[in-house]
Amino acid sequence: GFSTFMSYYMLSALADAGKTAEALSMLKTYYGGMLKAGATTFWEDFDIDWLKDGAALDSLSGEYDIHGDNGAHCYIGYRHSLCHGWSSAPAAFLAERVLGIRLLEPGCRRIGIYPELGGLEWAEGEYPTPYGTVSVKCRKTGDGKISVEYKAPEQIEIETGSGVSM
């Protein structure tokens, strides 16, 4: 099974094992399942099996209520949280692993950019720091490398890894 609470560690363990593409596939299936059920935020608890006969959040069909009839970490019928910090793993995983933004010393003075695109062709995002926003755009090139463009405040030193072209 998959757990919203443990998902960051599960996804990171896959990436550590060189399986970033598999981690992204799991992320798309699991968190994408919430989106298919009508989520606009990520939930405290979720099980893919709930989608089989469950009604979308914005419908009143005869199907069971995904929101009210489930939840391993709440009282059934009392509804679990539909916007919960346990489900924040995708934001950290995508920033740290896919975009590869790593803090190399306290205070954000040195940041490394070591993207792991997995099966993606490109990724882009922003990372807030005390000195301003670091913006990163990564794209796979024909020679198997990753092209990286970034913008960072002048107070921040950026380091990139091997296999990355600027």
Question: Where does each model-flagged region fall?
Answer:
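Non-catalytic C-terminal accessory modules of carbohydrate-active enzymes
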Residues: 21-166
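Well-ordered alpha-helical segments within folded domains of soluble proteins
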Residues: 2-16, 86-96
